[in-house]
Amino acid sequence: MPLIGMKLSILIAMLCPVFFAAAQLGAEEKKENPMNTSNEVAVIKTSEGDMVAEFWPDVAPKTVENFKKLARQGFYDGTAFHRIIKGFMIQGGDPLTKDESKRASWGMGDPGYKIAAEFNEKSHRRGVLSMARSNDPNSAGSQFFICHGDPTFLDRQYTAFGKLIKGDEVLEKIATTKTGPGDRPLKRINVESIKIVPADSIK
């Protein structure tokens, strides 16, 4: 074999394992990380301003997954915070609140299914997001609340799944809205949309 041909063959033989290893590594990385959803946040756009919440999938994976799914479907868009108790929490996520004629039934709506409770060690402090439910621990669906005070008596009895990282002033504004019978706000507090976005897109 000519010297040049021999050198070329040796070079190809040396490089092939390198290319193969690089391709294999890239395929493994793609397989292991098809889509990074652990670093996502929720942008809760309301008639009073925007709030941004981070998630706790390490302690409430199914709850976080359900909330993100509903948000991506536009389920929460056009709903309202229908129950407000200053110093305690603001509650929303009921699809019935899209219809003013169903006001008497507000607080009873759901997505048509229930999810299992994921009680955990996260404490209910100001800004924490948690799932609303009935007396049945496994009755949460879509309704959630954001703590205004520090209702730690709810710990390990309600599924905390995230907390606000921006918009505390909006929480304060909503929580101090004047209310009437049934803790209903006297003016409508719209949830215009809830969008799931990468955390690094938030400034």
What are the roles of these predicted feature ranges?
Residues 20-203:
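Cyclophilin-like peptidyl-prolyl cis-trans isomerases
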